[in-house]
Amino acid sequence: MLYTKHINLTDATETTMFTVPTGFHIIIYYVFIANHAGSTKTASLHFAESDGSNRVDIFDAENVSGGGRLTLDSGGGPMFVLHEGEVVKAQTEASSDMEFVVTFDLLEMPPSLVNFV
């Protein structure tokens, strides 16, 4: 089943959007970031293991103009697979009004894959 997680950030605090639940993995299909502020602000989005290791930066302090948007998709196919316990985090800068949206499929892990990761 597809889910969309949405957060709105207004300060520079790194915020966890979601953590992949135990026994599941997710396939990310779409990422959308919108800057609702009047001036250019930076946006960062990454995923990593719960302890912060194996971090992958999707957007790393990417400039988004006032009223601008960033999108990342693969034409409807999967982009990233995350496993149980991995987290997706977003961050912007102070005095921002930045919207982060991630659409993903949440799938139960088959018993044969539980020890694979």
Where are the language model's segments positioned?
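Short conserved beta-strand and strand-loop elements enriched in small hydrophobics
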Residues: 46, 88-91
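Beta-strand-rich interaction surfaces with strong enrichment in secreted/lumenal proteins
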Residues: 4-7, 59-62, 77-79, 89
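Short beta-strand segments
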Residues: 16, 41, 56-57, 70, ...
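Beta-sandwich interaction modules
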Residues: 67-85
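Short, surface-exposed beta-strand/strand-loop-strand elements in extracellular ectodomains
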Residues: 38-61
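Extracellular carbohydrate recognition and processing domains
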Residues: 7-13, 63-73
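C-terminal interaction-tip segments
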Residues: 1-26, 30, 36, 84, ...
